């Protein structure tokens, strides 16, 4: 089998450190709302946010639906009262400006640029993801951006990946390598349409390579 020549990168926690940006945004919106904040509260955000994204990946929830319930759910878990919709808006405004690269990611893109066709494939609002890539100095590395907010479908749906391929005329699925940290959205989603896959383990847990991935890398190998 020939080596893939089109690389599709997930964005959050693959190229950009979503967790770092979200933690900073959470602290800022709590301070602005006059709510108590402690770093350990971020663990509640992570658990509840991951649950909601898992529902999106299973097709049970839309990104718009996530916005409606995310902060309402998190505040309830923390025993705090505030306007969940206003907190969501404030959180997204701050996240829009967040551009903390995953360690080594800019250098990897620089090495690959010109040798492969690089694309981004991400769930999220289009303007937000474009702005974050621009602020991180990564935007110009990409030939195409496949962002769910503009694609009208989310990973891991076949519709999302089929629409990616439709915008790459003449490219067969097996010529594409989907790289990302989500075994569901990135690895299972890419594999389902015939793409080859590379699981990025951002925590460097040293876990065994999942059977649905063709390759595995961690931060130490970026």
Task: Indicate residue ranges for each PLM-predicted region.
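Asp-based, Mg2+/Mn2+-dependent phosphohydrolase catalytic module
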Residues: 1-7, 20, 31, 36, ...
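Glycine-centered short loops/turns at secondary-structure junctions
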Residues: 115-116, 194
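Short, conserved clusters of charged catalytic residues that mark active-site
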Residues: 103-104, 159
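Catalytic-core regions built around general acid/base machinery
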Residues: 104-115
